[in-house]
Amino acid sequence: MTLQLNTIALLLVILLILGVLSNNSAITISAAVLLIMQQTFLSSHIPLLEKYGVKIGIIILTIGVLSPLVSGKIQLPDLSGFLSWKMALSIAVGVLVAWLAGKGVPLMGEQPILVTGLLIGTIIGVAFLGGIPVGPLIAAGILALLLGKI
């Protein structure tokens, strides 16, 4: 087996290092898996990840978000809780964020080079600003809004 030293491999190594330095396991694991896939016989499966990866990731994320409700750790509020201004605002923010993320996915497909910038920005936000790495889709939606794609 020979290593393929190219710009994508270098980018994945940089993302791997940044993921480790920023204690971002999602970036670290993702970069490591993709680097291993790129450098081995598994490279033939990368198109499957490209086609279904975001959809599978959203499904897993949704399962993770709904799990505390199913396990009973989070209770549904009573009717008065649903009618409060805080609940109305949280629903509105949830709708806005879901809409933005929905607009970000096509932008990421149309201009995949922007994904690199979004990931670097996410890593910087996690490493230096105490952020949490859940924002690339929403960041892409905000970018689409700023670029006039919406």
UniProtKB/Swiss-Prot annotation:
It holds the Pfam family DUF441. The keyword Coiled coil does not apply. It comes from the Bacteria. Its main location: membrane. It is found in: Cell membrane. The chain crosses the membrane at residues 1-21, 52-72, 81-101, 123-143. InterPro entries: UPF0756_TM. Belongs to the UPF0756 family. This is UPF0756 membrane protein NTHI1233.
